[in-house]
From Swiss-Prot:
GO biological process: proteolysis
SUPFAM superfamilies associated with the record: alpha/beta-Hydrolases, Galactose-binding domain-like, X-Prolyl dipeptidyl aminopeptidase PepX, N-terminal domain
Keyword Ion transport: no
Keywords: Aminopeptidase, Cytoplasm, Hydrolase, Protease, Serine protease
Species for this entry: Streptococcus equi subsp. zooepidemicus (strain H70)
Location, primary (coarse class): cytoplasm
Catalytic activity line of the entry: Hydrolyzes Xaa-Pro-|- bonds to release unblocked, N-terminal dipeptides from substrates including Ala-Pro-|-p-nitroanilide and (sequentially) Tyr-Pro-|-Phe-Pro-|-Gly-Pro-|-Ile
Class of this enzyme: hydrolase
SMART domains xrefs: PepX_C (SM00939), PepX_N (SM00940)
Localisation: Cytoplasm
Organism classification: Bacteria, Bacillati, Bacillota, Bacilli, Lactobacillales
E.C. no: 3.4.14.11
Catalytic center residues: S349, D469, H499
InterPro entries: AB_hydrolase_fold, Galactose-bd-like_sf, Pept_S15_Xpro, PepX_N_dom, PepX_N_dom_sf, Xaa-Pro-like_dom, Xaa-Pro_dipept_C, Xaa-Pro_dipeptidyl-ppase/CocE
Protein known as: Xaa-Pro dipeptidyl-peptidase
Length: 761
């Protein structure tokens, strides 16, 4: 374990003492340090009437147990404090460490002992994470240090788990959205599942906008998958134009219906454990699936501003600007009189995507988005540089396939009977509009691009993204983060995993940092918390995070690619083509082993290379036909320790998100030997060599120059490392599988790689 403590808020001695005393630690500024230390330690064992017993099982020095030390005349030193603090945090001498001071350095222990400031040290110790992944104070509260009295209690600017999760209110309401997406003449109703504590004051909300949450139709999804095999068709030269997105919600009027209490409840809904963490701390949890999902009405419009409006309507209802009904009969309205109107949105992938879309509406009441692995442009999810490009791991998927998956109204037989015929008509229109034949950007995709609306965002923004996420690729967060107004509070966590959550990792106190931020923004706590702009996981060291100022370096380093002409064949023999089509992972494995059709250029680095941004290939090439796909990957090549893609479980159920509530596993990305690592990659239709909106001819067998930006990343390579450039045509995971007999020839002497770095000019 290594500490990267973002969430602790430095405080005054007076505040620290007051907060310790409020928790029952009977310390005083006038006490001798050792006396305060003893009082603090005995309070930790509040379950014991005889606190001598647990103290006797800890050690203070190599010669004295802790009980004997406290009774002795020995002074409280840094060595004693550190050794005892480590044990309090769950580290075991002779098991986890032997040399205390060496271990303190190794784990980056965040507390610097000062006998004159011991109470501040103890205050920070309570706010420091244990080996198990929870802070010491959260561990104590989970054991019953404070009662579940449904009132807010704070420590170091963060809410504690004092809301009763054994007696929660669960209710369903139906919010009226200013939409008629299924064209039935009635405004769409949006089902909202609410879980909230029995609080006596108005409370904020965590909202997860998840089109998956009311169920998914995997059968329809699988039937809709598109065939990847086919020929890349040459396109007529032209300049693509689009109009600004012009979504207009329908008019609504305040309801005059009588107000009633909730008429529908539920017992269980799958939850997100970060929401559970906040539920125990006095935040309502709302799960909303939006238009076209089971329990709601409307059509699944998949990513456009109509879908986003269906989630926005819920925030409007929480603020008294929209109507919610107790049932589909629409005979009673229900008020959110328990809400303080402030909302934070959470969730990964599609869920985080809806957070970004919501933020671009500028809706009042949306205080914070915590968007993980979020899409900012749906074109960049299903297309890339003029090519149909399946998201990593899902060849054949497209937006109409996702519509089939998430249109969960068809899981209700009555809805299927009444509405499926019309749904199929609307789905057919969607399939045509997305234009899978050309792969071009068009109005359909522009209406699902949130980047042009980024200047409307006014809430606090937190993004997390994996730099090995080839599902929602890093360009998604790179573009939106760099499009945000400078006036915003914006924050980005970049890790080296794939499409994963990171709130339960051992090496970083993400949950606690979000607690401090949300208490500041949604509960009026003037806690002085400041979250860094960019927090990046160092790829060269285990469990190490660094603060950065920018995603995208201003310096460039030009790297030559060689002096030869190289030929890349597109065509495979029938057996290999079928084998790769059946298992794209076999293709990837053989590509990295040098067995596929490819050109490989190995570059031995003569100095450190701190990559930050979009690597760019400047190439001179020609195609034997009037078409061509170019795919590229940059590898950190050669055996050494690197991160794995998926977090591994360190300890099951070690994280308690409340008081014996919603336990989850502690995880961390493994750091182990590997033969290579993908640094970045990309695919390009050569007809789009001058940009996404420009289609050009490819003259047969004539040299052309291309500019090819790969996915952005932040990745540091060291002097002596090998940077491998892999160039090929068809990518069996992502692109159309065109087996036509053409070849690309590259003039390496007239080509080079341009690497953005975070070096100073």
């Amino acid at each position: 374990m290594r500490y990267n403590q973002l969430s602790y808020i430095p405080t005054s001695l007076e505040t620290a003492v007051a907060e310790l005393q409020a928790l029952g630690f009977a310390v005083q500024q006038e006490q001798a340090p050792k006396e305060s230390f003893a009082i603090f330690l005995r309070k930790l064992f509040f379950h014991f009437q005889d606190t001598d017993y647990p103290l006797s099982h800890m050690i203070a020095t190599k010669e004295l147990d802790l009980l004997s030390f406290l009774a002795s005349d020995e002074a409280l030193t840094k060595e004693v404090f550190d050794l005892v603090a480590l044990q309090v945090l769950g580290f075991i001498p002779a098991v986890d460490f032997t040399d205390t001071q060496d271990f303190i350095q190794k784990i980056g222990f965040p507390i610097v002992f000062d006998s004159q400031q011991l109470l501040l040290n103890l205050h920070q110790l309570l706010a420091t994470r244990q080996k198990s992944g929870v802070t010491l104070i959260d561990s104590l509260v989970s054991q019953g240090l404070l009662p579940m009295d449904n009132c807010y209690h704070y420590f170091n600017g963060k809410a504690l788990a004092t809301f009763d999760t054994t007696s929660l209110i669960r209710e369903v309401v139906y919010v009226e959205a200013p939409l008629d997406t299924d064209q039935d003449g009635q405004l769409d109703l949006i089902k909202v599942n609410i879980i909230r504590p029995k609080a006596s004051t108005a409370i904020p909300s965590m909202m997860t906008a998840s089109p998956y949450h009311q169920g998914i139709n995997e059968t329809a999804n699988d039937k809709k998958l598109h065939r990847m095999e086919g020929e890349l068709s040459p396109k007529a030269p032209r300049r693509i134009t689009v109009e600004p997105t012009d979504f207009q919600p329908l008019a609504t009027k305040p309801s005059r219906l009588p107000v009633n209490e909730c008429q529908e409840t539920f017992s269980h809904i799958s939850s997100y454990t970060l929401n559970d963490y906040f539920l125990a701390r006095g935040f309502a949890n709302l799960y909303v699936s939006g238009v076209g999902t089971a329990g709601s009405t409307g059509f699944m419009t998949s990513g456009d501003y109509a879908q986003i409006e269906s989630f926005k309507a819920v925030i409007d209802w929480l603020n008294g600007r929209a109507t919610a009904y107790t049932s589909h009969k629409r005979d009673y309205q229900i008020k959110a009189d328990w809400s303080n109107g402030l909302v934070a949105t959470t969730g990964k992938s599609y869920l985080g995507t809806m957070s970004t879309g919501l933020a671009t509406t500028g809706v009042d009441g949306l205080a914070v988005i915590i968007a993980e692995a979020a899409i900012s442009s749906w074109y960049d999810y299903y297309r890339e540089n003029g090519l149909v490009c399946s998201p990593g791991g899902y060849p054949g998927e497209d937006l109409d396939v996702l519509t089939e998956l998430t249109y969960s109204r068809n899981l209700l037989p009555g809805d299927y009977l009444r509405h499926n015929d019309h749904y199929q008509e609307l789905l057919s229109q969607q399939s045509q509009a997305l234009d899978r034949q050309s792969g071009d950007y068009n109005q359909f995709w522009h209406d699902r691009n949130y980047l042009p609306q980024a200047d409307r965002i006014k809430c606090e923004v937190v993004y997390t993204h994996g730099l090995q996420d080839w599902n929602v690729k890093p360009r998604q967060v790179y573009n939106i983060f760099n499009a945000l107004p400078d006036s915003l509070g914006k924050h980005l966590f970049l890790h080296h995993g794939e499409h994963v959550y990171m709130h339960n990792w051992q090496s970083i106190d993400f949950r606690e940092a979000m607690n401090a931020l949300l208490c500041q923004k949604m509960l009026g706590q003037n806690n002085g918390f400041t979250l860094p702009t960019i927090i990046w996981q160092d790829n060269q060291k285990e469990q190490t995070w660094k603060e950065l100022t920018a995603f995208g370096g201003h310096s460039k380093r030009q790297i030559a690619l060689g002096e030869d002409h190289v030929l890349i064949d597109n065509h495979y023999g029938e057996e290999d083509f079928k084998r790769y089509g059946k298992d794209f992972r076999a293709f990837k494995a053989e590509l990295f082993e040098g067995k596929a059709n490819q050109a490989v250029i190995d570059i031995l680095l003569e100095e450190d290379l701190p990559i930050n941004g979009q690597a760019c290939l400047k190439l001179k090439l020609k195609s034997s036909e009037n078409k061509g796909i170019l795919s590229a990957q940059l590898l950190d090549y050669g055996k050494k320790k690197r991160f794995g893609d998926l977090p591994a479980i360190l300890e099951l159920d070690s994280i308690d998100n409340g008081q014996q509530f919603a336990r989850e596993a502690l995880k961390e990305l493994p750091f182990k030997d590997s033969p290579y690592r993908v640094v970045t990659k990309g695919v390009l239709n050569l007809q789009h060599r001058s940009g996404l909106l420009t289609i050009e001819d490819i003259p047969n067998d004539q040299w052309i120059s291309i500019t090819f930006h790969l996915q952005p990343t932040i990745y540091h390579m060291a002097k002596g490392d090998t940077l491998r450039v892999v160039l090929y045509t068809t990518d069996f995971e992502h692109t159309i599988r065109d087996n036509s007999n053409y070849a690309l020839t590259l003039d390496l002497e007239q080509s080079y790689l341009l690497i953005p770095t975070d070096e100073e000019e």
